[in-house]
Design a protein with these regions (language model features):
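Generic surface-pattern signal
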Residues: 73, 77-80, 98, 105, ...
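Mid-membrane cores of alpha-helical transmembrane segments in multi-pass membrane proteins
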Residues: 155-157, 182
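Short amphipathic alpha-helical coiled-coil/interface segments
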Residues: 97-100, 126-133, 160, 180, ...
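Non-transmembrane, amphipathic alpha-helical segments
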Residues: 49-60, 81-92, 117, 121-124, ...
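Extended, domain-scale alpha-helical bundle/helix-rich regions
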Residues: 165-222
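Short, charged/polar, low-complexity loop and linker segments
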Residues: 134-139, 157-168
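Generic N-terminal leader/targeting and pre-domain segments
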Residues: 1-131
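Generic recognition of well-structured, leucine-rich alpha-helical segments
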Residues: 2-5, 107, 136, 170, ...
Length: 222
């Protein structure tokens, strides 16, 4: 299990959407149990892969690169071909995927903290990912005037929420499916607008959905 932290939940107990996950650090910090300085130091040492030189040549990381990132590279090429605005947003998606990789590397070199995941230390390590997710979402908001690509931007903005699986336990797979459904709403609009007009846009939708499906398969396997 490589999930890094518990997700926030909605009032009905269901998994929170990514906009909520992007703020998980604040919620986790507010609700975190008080730890002694010794306990905090122990938990930090178990998670501290970002400031130490650790090997990323482990099966779970290689699988991420070979399975998920290879699909992302194909998506990135197709997205850049659509235009500079889309290219800029998909690069932000890539940065978010890199932050997930960093967490996977950290998790592969430590055991789950005995004090649990709902601590300020874990929230600290989730912060870069939360920032990356927020960047993708804010990019869409900053480009609402993009008539041609607004549905594309929204597809990525909604789908990026799926990376919040690292903050979901015990079953992150279904969470990815829920976020894919949110992205599908806008993806269907892209298909409706461009089917029979410009198939490259339709193919782009398929590529992004393939990324989400591949990531879910990775999570369910590892």
């Amino acid at each position: 299990d490589i999930a890094m932290a518990q997700s926030a939940t909605t009032s009905d107990g269901s998994a929170a959407p990514s906009s909520t996950v992007a703020g998980t650090a604040t919620a986790v910090t507010a609700n975190a149990p008080a730890l002694s300085s010794e306990e905090t130091a122990t938990q930090r040492s178990e998670l501290d892969a970002k400031d130490a030189v650790v090997s990323d040549d482990v099966p779970v990381v290689r699988a991420w690169d070979n399975e998920v990132m290879s699909v992302y590279q194909k998506l990135a090429e197709k997205t850049h071909a659509l235009g500079p605005v889309m290219g800029e947003q998909v690069d932000l998606v890539g940065k978010a995927l890199d932050e997930v990789r960093t967490l996977i590397v950290a998790a592969s070199h430590c055991r789950k903290p005995e004090q649990g995941l709902n601590t300020a230390v874990v929230a600290e390590y989730l912060q870069p990912l939360q920032t990356a997710l927020k960047s993708v979402i804010e990019f869409r908001e900053a480009h609402r005037g993009e008539k041609t690509f607004f549905n594309h931007l929204s597809t990525l903005s909604e789908g990026i929420s799926s990376l919040g699986w690292v903050a979901v336990e015990p079953t992150p797979g279904p969470y990815i499916s829920e976020m894919k459904d949110s992205a599908q709403f806008y993806a269907n609009r892209v298909i409706k607008d461009f089917k029979g007009v410009s198939e490259s846009h339709v193919d782009w939708v398929r590529s992004f959905m393939a990324l989400l499906d591949t990531m879910k398969s990775y999570v369910m396997t590892h």
